[in-house]
């Protein structure tokens, strides 16, 4: 019985989370309860915290008042580190506490660490308790910026004042990150050309030829007849590239001569496609249908390549083929009095070409529509041949 009542001394090192005070080392008994230890700390701790306001943490666990130190502290260690979290009595004493902390910074920061090397693992817990201490009822009377500033000033000399627990710094960092992300997104979209508006009107770039200098007063205005019905002259640039076509993405595309200069691979592909078509038609149809389709296909192919035209193509007059037509408004010698237009004298005299054109503009007939459907169907089965080149 005497061995059970014999006191078991133990050394306790009580640390404050915000480093307002030095680490307090005291001697106790393993038979003490946590409530007895809190009552002892209320007498020896500098701020004299009440037992109900104290929170003791050991190895990351919150100690309850009814627990015994014998069950919590291992016997292999002689010094045990406890973290004390308590409320502040009055905010008016904060300047005095800050002055004491400033005096303690003059001493080397590593003195306590060299004395107790096993306490290095508790530094992270010390920082985590800062935020918990800010939420206590003692800080409710202080505004948020002042509370954050006082908490940062209360950190030890080994810690920076710009900790990641400040809500002001967190909001500022979030704004900077959002701005940088937005600028990177704008730069990426501008580099990819997503914001480039499409051209309103697709125009073909025309190579402008140097125009000769105009002669001053070459045709006086009094010698020119007043022709109000003259059509505007269309200026055709002979130096422009005639092989340009419009591009769906914007800008011109130069026609290439791939359709004319075909290699053996293109001809082999066309022959293989046509042979597959013939085999399907031959094996899944009769001989008469096969001959009919073959004949129509040959006729359509000859018409498509230009060997078997149904009507002559109109000859296109290019600007380089002959001199430009005479302009009525530019007749300085009044040669218009030599004769009048035969069409104006005889309204019954109509050229035969005009009658043909008027007949074509009336509308397609049923036969022409049926022929167009037949031609389009069989032309889609054949590969596209080289275009006819006008002489």
Curated annotation (Swiss-Prot):
Keyword Glycoprotein: no
Gene3D superfamilies, per database record: Phosphatidylinositol 3-kinase Catalytic Subunit, Chain A, domain 1 (3.10.20.90)
Location of the region described as Disordered in the Swiss-Prot/TrEMBL record: 100-126, 318-359
Major subcellular site: endoplasmic reticulum
Membrane topology label: Multi-pass membrane protein
Residues recorded with modification N-acetylmethionine: 1
Gene Ontology molecular functions: transmembrane transporter binding
Interaction with UBQLN1, as annotated region: 115-200
Membrane listed as a keyword: yes
Lumenal side: 285-289
InterPro entries: HERPUD1/2, Ubiquitin-like_dom, Ubiquitin-like_domsf
Record's subcellular location: Endoplasmic reticulum membrane
Domain Ubiquitin-like: 10-72
Sites bearing Phosphoserine, chain numbering: 135
Transmembrane segments: 264-284, 290-310
Segments of skewed composition (Polar residues): 112-124
Topological region Cytoplasmic: 1-263, 311-391
Any one GO CC term of the record: endoplasmic reticulum membrane
A Pfam family the protein falls into: ubiquitin
SUPFAM superfamilies cross-referenced by the UniProt entry: Ubiquitin-like
Coiled-coil positions: none
PROSITE patterns per UniProt: UBIQUITIN_2 (PS50053)
PANTHER family, per database record: HOMOCYSTEINE-RESPONSIVE ENDOPLASMIC RETICULUM-RESIDENT UBIQUITIN-LIKE DOMAIN MEMBER 1 PROTEIN, HOMOCYSTEINE-RESPONSIVE ENDOPLASMIC RETICULUM-RESIDENT UNIQUITIN-LIKE DOMAIN HERPUD PROTEIN FAMILY MEMBER
Biological role: Component of the endoplasmic reticulum quality control (ERQC) system also called ER-associated degradation (ERAD) involved in ubiquitin-dependent degradation of misfolded endoplasmic reticulum proteins. Binds to ubiquilins and this interaction is required for efficient degradation of CD3D via the ERAD pathway.
Full protein name: Homocysteine-responsive endoplasmic reticulum-resident ubiquitin-like domain member 1 protein
């Amino acid at each position: 019985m005497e061995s059970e009542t014999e006191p078991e001394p133990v050394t306790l090192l009580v640390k404050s989370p915000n480093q307002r005070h030095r680490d307090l080392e005291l001697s106790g008994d393993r038979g003490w309860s946590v409530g007895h230890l809190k009552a002892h700390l209320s007498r020896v701790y500098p701020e004299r915290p009440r037992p109900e306001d104290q929170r003791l943490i050991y190895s990351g666990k919150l100690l309850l008042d009814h627990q015994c130190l014998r069950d919590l502290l291992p016997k292999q260690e002689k010094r045990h580190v406890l973290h004390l979290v308590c409320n502040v009595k009055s905010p008016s004493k904060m300047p005095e506490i800050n002055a004491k902390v400033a005096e303690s910074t003059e001493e080397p920061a590593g003195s306590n660490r060299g004395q107790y090397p096993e306490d290095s693992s508790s530094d992270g817990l010390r920082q985590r308790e800062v935020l918990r201490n800010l939420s206590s009822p003692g800080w409710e009377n202080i505004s948020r910026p002042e509370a954050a500033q006082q908490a940062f000033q209360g950190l030890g000399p080994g810690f920076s004042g710009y900790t990641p627990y400040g809500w002001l710094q967190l909001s500022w960092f979030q704004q900077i990150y959002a701005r940088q992300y937005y600028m990177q997104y704008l730069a990426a979209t501008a580099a990819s050309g997503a914001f480039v508006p499409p051209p309103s009107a697709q125009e073909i770039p025309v190579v402008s030829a140097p125009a000769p200098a105009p002669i001053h007063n070459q045709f006086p205005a009094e010698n020119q007849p007043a022709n109000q019905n003259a059509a505007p002259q269309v200026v055709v640039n002979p130096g422009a590239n005639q092989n340009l076509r419009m591009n769906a993405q914007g800008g011109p595309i130069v026609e290439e001569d791939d359709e004319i200069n075909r290699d053996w691979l293109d001809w082999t592909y066309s022959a293989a496609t046509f042979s597959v078509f013939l085999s399907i038609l031959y094996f899944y149809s009769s001989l008469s249908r096969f001959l009919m389709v073959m004949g129509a296909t040959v006729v359509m192919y000859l018409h498509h390549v230009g060997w078997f035209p149904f009507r002559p193509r109109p000859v296109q007059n290019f600007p380089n083929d002959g001199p430009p037509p005479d302009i009525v408004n530019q007749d300085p010698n009044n040669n218009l009095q030599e004769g009048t237009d035969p069409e104006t004298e005889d309204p019954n005299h109509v050229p035969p070409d005009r009658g043909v054109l008027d007949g074509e503009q009336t509308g397609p007939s049923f036969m022409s529509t049926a022929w167009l459907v037949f031609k389009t169907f069989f032309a889609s089965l054949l590969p596209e041949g080289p275009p006819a080149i006008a002489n």
